[in-house]
Amino acid sequence: MQNTCLMIARCLALATVSLAPAVCQAGSDNYNRAVATFDAVVKCYGDERLPLFRETYPFDDQLKVTYLSNEEQADQQKRFSYLWPFSGSLSAVAAIWDARLDPRFGQVLEQQVRPGLEMYFDSVRTPAAYSSYLNTAPASDRFYDDNIWIGLDFTDLYRLTRDPRYLEQAKLVWRFIESGIDNQLGYGIYWCEQKKNGKNTCSNAPGSVYVAKLYLVTGDSSYLRTAVRLYEWTRTNLQDPTDGLYFDNKSLDGTIGRAKFAYNSGQMMQASALLYRLTGEEHYLREARRLAAACYEHFFAAPSQPGRRYRVFTPGNVWFTAIMVRGFIELYGIDYDRRYIDAIQENLDQAWTNGMREENGLFNDDWTGQTRNESKWLLTQFAMAEMYARLALIDAEE
């Protein structure tokens, strides 16, 4: 396994070197930048023995993550990343492979990413699913949203390759997600299997996208019915009527967690666009466009630098931004209105040259390039690779 991981790192490094002249050209190098960013992740976060990644760079053996539901688990497990950041490797590789169909990334998927992902897989508890930490450690919580992101990627990989293994895995993950649906609050998916105290947009919005995509690749109408039901539940329970954006969660006592995150509204934008494609019902398209305008107003800031034409992504969780970008791209596939795609492209072009990206190929969180992070999170890097790859696919199709 050590030789395999090092071989992958060398192959990607060689690919980056061979593409380096193109990377210097602005606006048309999305694929090269995606490859270079993924290569930097392997170099800086990869392990020499196992197909796993560290959570941060530089490595911090005292790190305590803040996104779990269990403080004790956050104290105990530090050597490798948790599932959520690791799963970004699956999203990034799937997007890069989709953009160019380079067989090298099929090899990366099968030789590094999938073997690493299987180290989080828990078949002891039923239904089987991915745990938040390695299956060699004490049993850890299992999050419905973490598993949804993985199931989405396997569904996309099946669409890309028609390899039945990917569809089988996508369906297996969905069975776990279904176990997290009940009639508390009227319907909806919980956030965490072990902490069923509320239902979150981050489970239900991508849950709708996920099951809509399962319908797209299987034709099973039960998936479409579930996609619509999850979508309607989320709109009814978690949408802010004043601006159309989405709150974070609803507790079982009815309390609304009113924080607004880019990925939540972005996933409802993607769900709206997908459901329009699948049903032809105009109200879904109207809602997707409404959300696109609201996201552009709320999650982009007016530019402060001279010469910028478009609004700038607000600082914060870069992966949240990447998930929102999926929604803009889904809508673009319907109406081909470039205004939001051009804004995303300008942000990605600026990020490459304005100091957001450092000499080691890793990115900070500030899209203006003015603030640097001493510790760089794994998922931020995979999110950047994914965004460049998704824009590269648009380049290839035009």
Q: Which functions belong to the PLM regions below?
A:
Residues 93-96, 154-157, 211-214, 272-275, ...:
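The core hydrophobic/aromatic register in alpha-helical repeat solenoids, strongest
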Residues 28-92, 96-145, 199, 283, ...:
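CBM-like carbohydrate-recognition segments
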Residues 106-217, 221-225:
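Extended ligand-binding groove/face enriched in aromatic
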Residues 118, 178-179, 216, 235-236, ...:
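Amphipathic alpha-helical segments of tetratricopeptide repeats
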Residues 202-207, 211-215, 223-275:
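Active-site cradle of extracellular carbohydrate-active enzymes
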